[in-house]
Regions:
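Alpha-helical, coiled-coil/dimerization segments enriched in small aliphatic residues
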Residues: 203-229
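Solvent-exposed loop/turn segments at secondary-structure junctions
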Residues: 43-47, 63-66, 108-109, 114-117, ...
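Extracytoplasmic substrate-binding proteins
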Residues: 21, 119-199, 228, 278-340
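A short, structured surface patch at a secondary-structure boundary
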Residues: 46-102, 108, 112-114, 219
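Structural recognition of the beta-strand scaffold that forms the well-ordered cores
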Residues: 39-41, 58-61, 108-112, 132-136, ...
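Boundary at the C-terminal end of the N-terminal hydrophobic targeting segment
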Residues: 16-18
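Sec-dependent N-terminal signal peptides
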Residues: 4-13
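Short helices/loops that flank or line small-molecule/ion binding pockets
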Residues: 95-106, 231-242
Length: 340
């Protein structure tokens, strides 16, 4: 491994054009003026790299055929499948194949500003003098500045500013709706995860951020214990809470809930208020928490506050995919993608 350390010291020494920028952890980071090779150590940062500077991506932290990504999606470039998969620091994953990663000569590492992983990531890459740029992207409201920050790191400021301003406008519209509804008038929402629907997220968890941003009464209030989340609850607890709306992340659960007698008595089921989270190309609410949540909160607002949400969600979806993912989408494709 010493030869790799020497190699990277030499490469960075030979980088004549560099700049000092501040990451979202408040650290001064020296990065190349022109980034040609980057690596994102977690899926949220990888998706930011993709919408800003896909040509710089050297490797994936998760394979394109993992359950994070929609199977055979047409909204991500197929070239991603050709990139080596080296791992990263996120969820239950703690580490990358450093030999492979170092052979790709990344000039900058985009990493998650999370107390769960920061120290380990910083320590790992300090040994090789590779700059680590931390990005805060836990909450939905972090997204505009996360985009701007990644844009500065990757030398894509203009593109980042265009996306960030669009994100701010979309989020402001949803926030205005949220703020117009008294807290005691907001629907009670249960976020059902897993094939049995008995995993969920704490109200204070970053996994629950889209729901909190839109304005709901959470079915459960607790404290997130791990980066993964997925807090277990039982049927008796759910029946006692009797949510107005259920948002399901798992398609198997969504399909089964309508005929499952255990769930039949719930208000949300009886009133046909169970919704499946859109996931093409990735989950628009969570896992990973990404820029897709900008559209995700619009979709949530359209189903949770339908009287107040006056925009055409299909047009919002198509324009989002065009701007962020550079993909055209018909009205029919938009309807299929978000389940309308």
């Amino acid at each position: 491994m010493k030869k790799y350390a020497l190699l990277f010291s030499f490469l960075l020494f030979c980088t004549l054009e560099a700049k000092d920028i501040t990451d979202m952890a408040g650290r001064k980071v020296v990065v190349p003026d022109k980034v040609e090779r980057s690596f994102a150590s977690a899926p949220p940062m990888g998706l930011l790299s993709y919408i800003l500077a896909p040509e710089t991506m050297t490797a994936m932290n998760l394979p394109l055929d993992s359950n994070f990504y929609f199977k055979d999606t047409k909204y991500l470039d197929k070239s991603l499948a050709k990139l080596p998969v080296v791992g990263g620091w996120h969820g239950n994953t703690r580490g990358a194949n450093m030999e492979t990663l170092l052979s790709l000569k990344p000039q900058i590492i985009l990493a998650w500003k999370s107390d769960f992983v920061m120290k380990e990531v910083e320590k790992t890459f300090a040994k090789f003098n590779i700059p680590v740029f931390f990005i805060q992207e836990d909450l939905v409201e972090d997204e505009p500045n996360a985009i701007r920050s990644a844009g500065r790191a990757l030398g894509k400021e203009a593109r980042a500013e265009t996306l960030a301003k669009d994100a701010e406008a979309r989020l402001a519209y949803v926030a205005k709706i949220r703020d117009s509804i008294p807290k005691d008038k907001r629907p009670k929402v249960y976020y059902a995860e897993g094939a049995d629907g008995l995993s969920t997220e704490c109200e204070a968890s970053f996994h629950f951020s889209p729901f909190k941003f839109v304005g709901v009464r959470p079915a459960f209030e607790c404290t997130q214990k791990t980066m993964v989340g997925l807090e277990k609850v039982n049927m008796e607890q759910i029946l006692a809470e009797d949510p107005d709306i259920i948002v399901a992340s798992d398609e198997a659960f969504f399909k089964s809930v309508w005929s499952d007698k255990k769930w039949a008595g719930l208000k949300a089921v009886k009133n046909k208020k169970v919704y499946l989270t859109p996931k093409d190309p990735v989950n628009i609410l969570d896992r990973p928490p990404s820029f897709m949540r900008i559209l995700g909160v619009e979709w949530l607002a359209s189903i949770i506050h339908p009287q107040e949400f006056k925009k055409d969600i299909l047009k919002e979806t198509a324009s989002f995919y065009k701007l962020y993912l550079r993909k055209d989408m018909t009205k029919a494709e938009a309807a299929k993608t978000i389940g309308k």
